[in-house]
Each structure stands twice: as C-alpha cells, then as structure tokens.
C-alpha cells in the first residue's frame, strides 16, 4: 500500500 498502515 502507499497510505499509512496497509502492508502492500
């Protein structure tokens, strides 16, 4: 992921 706290 590209936001705070998401793993991918």
Curated annotation (Swiss-Prot):
Keyword Magnesium assigned: no
Protein location: Secreted
Record GO terms (molecular function): toxin activity
Cystine pairings recorded for this chain: 1-6
Tissues expressed in: Expressed by the venom duct. Is present in all duct parts with a highest content in the proximal part (part 1) (27%), part 2 (29%), and the distal part (part 5) (26%).
Main location: secreted
Modified-residue entries (4-hydroxyproline), positions: 7
GO cellular component, one term: extracellular region
Keywords carried by this UniProt record: Disulfide bond, G-protein coupled receptor impairing toxin, Hydroxylation, Secreted, Toxin
Reported function: Targets vasopressin-oxytocin related receptors.
Entry text on domains: The cysteine framework is C-C.
Family note: Belongs to the vasopressin/oxytocin family.
Protein name stated in the entry: Conopressin-Tx
Organism: Conus textile
Taxonomic lineage: Eukaryota, Metazoa, Spiralia, Lophotrochozoa, Mollusca
């Amino acid at each position: 992921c590209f936001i705070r706290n998401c793993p991918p």
